[in-house]
Amino acid sequence: MQPGIPKYTPSAIQLAPVVTGKFGERPQPKRLTREAMRNYLKERGDQTVLILHAKVAQKSYGNEKRFFCPPPCVYLMGSGWKKKKEQMERDGCSEQESQPCAFIGIGNSEQEMQQLNLEGKNYCTAKTLYISDSDKRKHFMLSVKMFYGNSDDIGVFLSKRIKVISKPSKKKQSLKNADLCIASGTKVALFNRLRSQTVSTRYLHVEGGNFHASSQQWGAFYIHLLDDEESEGEEFTVRDGYIHYGQTVKLVCSVTGMALPRLIIRKVDKQTALLDADDPVSQLHKCAFYLKDTERMYLCLSQERIIQFQATPCPKEPNKEMINDGASWTIISTDKAEYTFYEGMGPINAPVTPVPVVESLQLNGGGDVAMLELTGQNFTPNLRVWFGDVEAETMYRCAESMLCVVPDISAFREGWRWVRQPVQVPVTLVRNDGVIYSTSLTFTYTPEPGPRPHCSAAGAILRANSSLLASNEPNTNSEGSYTNISTNSANVTSSTAAVVS
């Protein structure tokens, strides 16, 4: 526990005092101006909170404490954290008062929240979290309470949903328990634990352009299913479906894009790799990764290094190969909650949470008005949609849905009737006190070929520049296709399916 920082329990986290600024005054909330939005779009000084965690957690029984593995990790990303610290110190705060502080818990009142030490670094892992058998929840979410050293509240950030399991399934898994199986294209963590000792746990991780076994940080890797005939190459074609033992896979770091060579995933029984197992891979299973087209070489760790280990054939059992402890990896699915915000009009009185997250866009048209529907989470009535530096008329529906009127292209381009190039603008959400919540989505006004008819809305194509896979089907409304506003239909496009190692 750091000196001068109070011990927090879940029942107390809402009671952190708000410290006023100079002479006891805090600035009144200000609506965002176009000039402030232009400055933001130019500088992009976002503050981002990332919560990385496993999708499942093993329950602890009696007095035992099965700590979550890999440990949940909180990252503070973006240049905004440094800028916020500098701004607070310019306003008279000490270095300790401008330091972000964080506590993490499992969202129940019985267990104390644990402090995360963020001093001097942008990440921290919570190594001693567990869930006991007295907690009857089948799912839960991690809760991260953040504030500055001067007690200014940042907010409470939630992880994605985590499933509670009793122990790894030893039965031959079937696809009936799909939530315990691992699908192609999802993210996993891999860790190795020698002689079942927690202190010896090491995680597959990429740092400095190399794969290594880290005791401090873990990596999230896309696991892609390949055709057995797929050759080694920087680009490869991926398959859908659940991962089964005996199949060819590719592991790609979700942060750097670095990939390992083609691997065949094999089931581990004691200190042997089973060559003929073909059941679905399940959460917290032990598995081995054979480097395809090699002489019994397996992915293995030696201290912090990742090496190739040559297995030994079992003389009496041709369907097994003997491996050492360093080639046995535990596999688990991972998830990520990401929250991005920026104080567009300077310091605010309230927490930045709940942070809205936009998951998809849908264009609807009728008459002279084009409407954009936003689907996501944590929407509130005090949010407005902005297209670039233009505020749109916004209608709140519920916490998962909002509507807005697409601004006329003339708001962005004078002489728009002669524009022949597409005009692309970012879509953001802005709270009524000036907090900007960026999305990874953009809206593109696409000009029509030939003479322009006079209409109040230009043709539009939505481009979702996010990791979300969206439909390529044209959007239609009750009156038919979108051609009553433009001769262009509206399509949502996604990034390419090719994965580059």
Swiss-Prot record:
CDD domains on file:
IPT_RBP-Jkappa
Protein localization? Nucleus; Cytoplasm
Q: Which residues form the IPT/TIG domain?
A: 356-446
Q: Which Pfam families match?
A: BTD, LAG1-DNAbind, TIG_SUH
Q: Name one GO molecular function term.
A: DNA-binding transcription activator activity, RNA polymerase II-specific
Tell me the keywords, alphabetical order: Activator, Cytoplasm, Developmental protein, DNA-binding, Notch signaling pathway, Nucleus, Repeat, Repressor, Transcription, Transcription regulation
Example GO biological process: positive regulation of transcription by RNA polymerase II
Q: Which GO CC terms are listed, alphabetically?
A: cytoplasm; MAML1-RBP-Jkappa- ICN1 complex; nucleus
UniProt region (DNA-binding), positions on chain: 58-68, 166-171, 193-198
Q: Which InterPro entries match?
A: Beta-trefoil_DNA-bd_dom, BTD_sf, CLS_fam, Ig-like_fold, Ig_E-set, p53-like_TF_DNA-bd_sf, RBP-J/Cbf11/Cbf12_DNA-bd, RBP-J/Cbf11_DNA-bd_sf
Coarse class of the protein's main subcellular location: nucleus
Q: What is stated as this protein's family in its record?
A: Belongs to the Su(H) family.
- Spell out the subunit comment: Interacts with activated Notch proteins. Forms a ternary complex with nrarp and the intracellular domain (NICD) of notch1. Interacts with rita1, leading to nuclear export, prevent the interaction between rbpj and NICD product and subsequent down-regulation of the Notch signaling pathway.
Functional summary from the UniProt entry = Transcriptional regulator that plays a central role in Notch signaling, a signaling pathway involved in cell-cell communication that regulates a broad spectrum of cell-fate determinations. Acts as a transcriptional repressor when it is not associated with Notch proteins. When associated with some NICD product of Notch proteins (Notch intracellular domain), it acts as a transcriptional activator that activates transcription of Notch target genes. Required for the transcriptional activation of ESR1, suggesting that it is required during primary neurogenesis in embryos.
Return the protein name.
Answer: Suppressor of hairless protein homolog
Species of origin reads Xenopus laevis (African clawed frog)
Gene behind this protein: rbpj
